[in-house]
Amino acid sequence: MRGARLMGALLALAGLLQGALALRMAAFNIRTFGETKMSNATLSKYIVQILSRYDVAVVQEVRDSHLTAVGKLLDTLNQDDPNAYHYVVSEPLGRSSYKERYLFLFRPDRVSVLDSYQYDDGCEPCGNDTFSREPAIVRFHSPLTEVKEFAVVPLHAAPLDAVAEIDALYDVYLDVQHKWDLEDIVLMGDFNAGCSYVAASQWSSIRLRTNPAFQWLIPDTADTTSTSTHCAYDRIVVAGSQLQHAVVPESAAPFNFQVAYGLSSQLAQAISDHYPVEVTLKRA
């Protein structure tokens, strides 16, 4: 137990030191994030502690139709500084009555939002749309890092459609390129890109994987889950030479908050069944 606590303390210290020197981004699928979770003092405490590590974070599985939980989250993040975090949130997304939002949290003293838009993947009532939850895309200006502008494309893929949705991210990438004349793009989130949802034989049919323009920063061998499974569901993919050069070597990884904070397995899973995946960009 002492060894686990020491490792957790070292991870936390390393995170603080690295965060002071660069820009840290993450994608975090917080299972069923809504009013119930934010009303639980213990769970909300750790969610805020985790998200406070990041300068830019994309939260997935936001189940908050009236943005009440999002408001509570921002109030807590900003309790010591009312401008510590700002946010951009998508409309509720989904083909049925079940809807989720993408939530972008960012520190305005580190980055600013230049533009945003909702990707149009087709007609949902017609049954010819591509994504269960089509990406909402944000373009950031980052004056403190080597790369000054980049876009973030999130995806929470439907598990049974993971192969098709990950492949279709290539089309989203092209759309962002064309719309903003921008090469430096981060695609990240819970792609469900592992275990039974993407077989080894299927990777060759996924353009986002086979095209050498893309660097996959989270390897297939990673475990991004807090449960007993060992699956690399959550990924970070970067495109654009400036952005790829700006990535701090070996900074991309899942953040195991169970180890870092010395939590029980039960509490860790109550926070979420996923760990955040994170990456750090070099300062200019």
Swiss-Prot record:
InterPro entries (UniProt xref): Deoxyribonuclease-1_AS, DNase_I, DNASE_I_2, Endo/exonu/phosph_ase_sf, Endo/exonuclease/phosphatase
Tissue specificity of this protein: Highest expression in pancreas.
The name this protein goes by in its record: Deoxyribonuclease-1
SMART domains hit by this protein: DNaseIc (SM00476)
Pfam families: Exo_endo_phos
Disulfide pairings: C123-C126, C195-C231
Keywords associated with the record: Actin-binding, Apoptosis, Calcium, Cytoplasmic vesicle, Disulfide bond, Endonuclease, Glycoprotein, Hydrolase, Nuclease, Nucleus, Secreted, Signal
Record SUPFAM superfamilies: DNase I-like
Catalytic activity: Endonucleolytic cleavage to 5'-phosphodinucleotide and 5'-phosphooligonucleotide end-products
Enzyme Commission (EC) number: 3.1.21.1
Organism, as annotated: Canis lupus familiaris (Dog)
